[in-house]
């Protein structure tokens, strides 16, 4: 029968239907081609917002730089980046006054972090700008390449493995007159294959040394590479995001550690917590404002939107904030933290891949790299691109755009939140000194503002005062996109509040379904997602049961593992039918082996192997989970794995699921074609690097109280640890005397090899 969809909504309160309007089903839009245009947009817009600032020239790189700080006060509602330093410092002082000891304690915590953080922090993260090759690489590889170049230039402080020592090398590298780097290049030649006697193209990878002058090196060290942000829903236009190189990353990490420590102590901050914890924090602020308003006051909430948050922020303001926050701290600590904002004040934006041209008549395609845009004839470009290039040309140095104002997406989320909260903090009556007062929530660029006042005029005055105060620190609340409502109904970071948070279930839709890792992980992740949504997102029992049935169906179609007694023919059905017939206890077969589904909403927390273990035939158990079976994954069995799930909004979330190693937890092999390209050496480096890190983790698991600090190399640290562990094991009788002697012998051999290697 046909169902009229409007009937579905008859008994549903309007706020619960909000999620159906979200663009979250189906595939998200991806960008194709080059991000160069989007990057030029960002650079040009950022300069436009600060155009009344002062121009200077960087003495080292020759880059023209625009400084809008303490610029003219805005006279209209247009977005602008003219933050006033004294206003920012005053906001910081009031924030500290309302939270005694806030900055002091956070500095102490961060100092400990700075001294203990190891370099492997920088191997996290995916694509990173690799300044040695001038393109993006996985983080671990980019770090390895940087260290290799540092070492060949006599910078070796990083060998201690401490991040702070690596940063000392970075500082020293910037004073060097020149840096020698190794670049990779490809040679192609045609040779005859001995076996087939056909001509084939043989590629050889060459490495060549290249010297960078101080100027060129500094430009690369200060460069952010840009890409297009993918999979953004609900937007017509794509936008550019940036990835910084290894020189900047470590410094940013420490600044964010300090800011995170501050945010954790601020009740108005939506970072760094998430999920239910965040909702609880928000609900508290709302409750406070509503209880205080009671009968005498009105309470209104603005669901806020800021215009181009990043492009109006300024690194110089962050420098002022850090200078104030750390004012009573040791000199070395203040210096380490002030470097990130200084580097960002001098940053350069790499314009991405450039443009692709094709001539229909001659069937020719050619790539114009971004570096050529400075002096190419503009007649080849269309009107809008021509305008962009003309605007950006004065800013280009060695093919890279100088971008002093603005912050680029996601670099200082925590610190910019501190700035936002400091303005919310000024809403207390003791600061407004009038009848209206405000409070609110801030999470990076998203905010909700709650204003209380005796009458509507007071509310209006309060919002106006907030708006103007924000302008003084370079925050531009958008009057077009923000809206105001009686307190009790608002939206903040995609959480919808209506006398309590409404579950926005559509946000979770993209994470339902089969992940495509392997049969074992996919089953586990699928049921965990359903379980988590029953806990956190009002997924009711009937809907959950339906979701489960749909998931199992989807899973069977993905892996072609329909039940052994089904009529559906797939390329696996012959084997699965055979297995079905041979099996005595058919209920014990896993779904991926053609077995029945035993999951229901009551047992989603049990891994499938555990659920069916007692029902399995003995020989099936033996094949499925036998570590000697070559098809059982040989990764160590950790009871919990992490999967990356894609919610519809915000970054990919890490989700824990139970992992049982069976013949179904295979790991797909890398695509072979990479092994024949210039990436091959890089791939091998990456694997070696990964192996070394894993080995180190084995010696110093995170559970051991502290990682070694101040020992001269990873190798020495591991050898000394091995000796200590061996002695403990020997004295407690866990290992025999011969084994103990052998371990000591191996340790000495390793040390000897290490000495020869030096």
Curated annotation (Swiss-Prot):
GO terms for biological process: DNA-templated transcription; symbiont-mediated suppression of host gene expression; symbiont-mediated suppression of host mRNA transcription via inhibition of RNA polymerase II activity; viral RNA genome replication; viral transcription. Its main location: host cell. The lineage of its organism: Viruses, Riboviria, Orthornavirae, Negarnaviricota, Polyploviricotina. Phosphorylated by host PRKCA. Keywords: Eukaryotic host gene expression shutoff by virus, Eukaryotic host transcription shutoff by virus, Host cytoplasm, Host gene expression shutoff by virus, Host nucleus, Host-virus interaction, Inhibition of host RNA polymerase II by virus, Nucleotide-binding, Nucleotidyltransferase, Phosphoprotein, RNA-directed RNA polymerase, Transferase, Viral RNA replication, Viral transcription. InterPro entries: RNA-dir_pol_NSvirus, RNA_pol_PB1_influenza. RNA-dependent RNA polymerase which is responsible for replication and transcription of virus RNA segments. The transcription of viral mRNAs occurs by a unique mechanism called cap-snatching. 5' methylated caps of cellular mRNAs are cleaved after 10-13 nucleotides by PA. In turn, these short capped RNAs are used as primers by PB1 for transcription of viral mRNAs. During virus replication, PB1 initiates RNA synthesis and copy vRNA into complementary RNA (cRNA) which in turn serves as a template for the production of more vRNAs. This is RNA-directed RNA polymerase catalytic subunit. Belongs to the influenza viruses polymerase PB1 family. Residues 53-82 are annotated as: Disordered. Residues 286-483 form the RdRp catalytic domain. It is an enzyme of class 2 (transferase). GO terms for cellular component: host cell cytoplasm; host cell nucleus.
């Amino acid at each position: 029968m046909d169902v009229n969809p409007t009937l579905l909504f008859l008994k549903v309160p309007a706020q619960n239907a909000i999620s159906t309007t979200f663009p979250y089903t189906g595939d998200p839009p991806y960008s194709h081609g080059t991000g160069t245009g989007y990057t030029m947009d960002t650079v040009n817009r950022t300069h436009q917002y600060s155009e009344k600032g002062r121009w200077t020239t960087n003495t080292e790189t020759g880059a023209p730089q625009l400084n809008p700080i303490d610029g003219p006060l805005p006279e209209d509602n247009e977005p602008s980046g003219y933050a006033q330093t004294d206003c920012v410092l005053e906001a910081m002082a009031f924030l500290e006054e309302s939270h005694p000891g806030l900055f002091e304690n956070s500095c102490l915590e961060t100092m400990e972090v700075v001294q203990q953080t190891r370099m492997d922090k920088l191997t996290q993260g995916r694509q990173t700008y690799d300044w040695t090759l001038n393109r993006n690489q996985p983080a671990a590889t980019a770090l390895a390449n940087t260290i290799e170049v540092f070492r060949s230039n006599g910078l070796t402080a990083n060998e201690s493995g401490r991040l702070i020592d690596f940063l000392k090398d970075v500082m020293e590298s910037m004073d060097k007159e020149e840096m020698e780097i190794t670049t990779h290049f490809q040679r192609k030649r045609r040779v005859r294959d001995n076996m087939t006697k056909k001509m084939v193209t043989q590629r050889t990878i060459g490495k060549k040394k290249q010297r960078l002058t101080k100027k060129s090196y500094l430009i690369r060290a200060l460069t952010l590479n840009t890409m297009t942000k993918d999979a953004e829903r609900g937007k017509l236009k794509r936008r550019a995001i940036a990835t910084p190189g290894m020189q900047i990353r470590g410094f940013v990490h420490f600044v964010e550690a300090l800011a995170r420590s501050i945010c954790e102590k601020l009740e108005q901050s939506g970072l760094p917590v998430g999920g239910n914890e965040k909702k609880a924090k928000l609900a508290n602020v709302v409750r406070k404002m509503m209880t205080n308003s009671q009968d005498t006051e009105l309470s209104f909430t603005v669901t806020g939107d800021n215009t181009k948050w990043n492009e109006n922020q300024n690194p110089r303001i962050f420098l002022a904030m850090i200078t104030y926050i750390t004012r009573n701290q040791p000199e070395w600590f203040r210096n380490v933290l002030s470097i990130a904002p200084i580097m960002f004040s001098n940053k350069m934006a790499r314009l991405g891949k450039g443009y692709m041209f094709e001539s229909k008549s001659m069937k020719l395609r050619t790539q114009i790299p971004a570096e050529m845009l400075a002096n190419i004839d503009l007649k080849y470009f269309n009107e809008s691109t021509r305008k962009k290039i003309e605007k950006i040309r004065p800013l280009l140095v060695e093919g890279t755009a100088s971008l002093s104002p603005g912050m680029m997406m996601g670099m200082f989320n925590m610190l910019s939140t501190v700035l936002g909260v400091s303005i919310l903090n000024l809403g207390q009556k003791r600061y407004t000194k009038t009848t209206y007062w405000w409070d609110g929530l801030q999470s990076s660029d998203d905010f909700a503002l709650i204003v209380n006042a005796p009458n509507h005029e007071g509310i209006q005055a309060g919002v106006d005062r907030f708006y103007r105060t924000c302008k003084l620190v370079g925050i531009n609340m958008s009057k077009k996109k923000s809206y105001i409502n009686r307190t009790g109904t608002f939206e903040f970071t995609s959480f919808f509040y209506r006398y309590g948070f409404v579950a926005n279930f559509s946000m979770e839709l993209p994470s339902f379904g089969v992940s495509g890792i392997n049969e074992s992980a996919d089953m586990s992740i699928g049921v965990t997602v359903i379980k988590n949504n029953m806990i956190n997102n009002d997924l009711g029992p009937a809907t959950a049961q339906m979701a489960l049935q749909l998931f199992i169906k989807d899973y069977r179609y993905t892996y072609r593992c329909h039940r052994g007694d089904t009529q559906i023919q797939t390329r696996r059905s012959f084997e699965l039918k055979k297995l079905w017939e041979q099996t005595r206890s058919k209920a014990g077969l896993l779904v991926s082996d053609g077995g029945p589904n035993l999951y229901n909403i009551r047992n989603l927390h049990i891994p499938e192997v555990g659920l069916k273990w007692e029902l399995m035939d003995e020989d099936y158990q033996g094949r499925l989970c036998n570590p000697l079976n070559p098809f059982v994954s040989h990764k160590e069995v950790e009871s919990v794995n992490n999967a990356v799930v894609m919610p519809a909004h915000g970054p990919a979330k890490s989700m824990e699921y139970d992992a049982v190693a069976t013949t179904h937890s295979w790991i797909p092999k890398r695509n072979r074609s990479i092994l024949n390209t210039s990436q091959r050496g890089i791939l091998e480096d990456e694997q070696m690097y990964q192996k070394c890190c894993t080995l180190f983790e084995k010696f110093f698991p995170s559970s051991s109280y502290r990682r070694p600090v101040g020992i001269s190399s990873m190798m020495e640290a591991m050898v000394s640890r091995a000796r200590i562990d061996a002695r403990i094991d020997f004295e407690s009788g866990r290992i025999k005397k011969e084994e103990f002697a052998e371990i000591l012998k191996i340790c000495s051999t390793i040390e000897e090899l290490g000495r020869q290697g030096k």
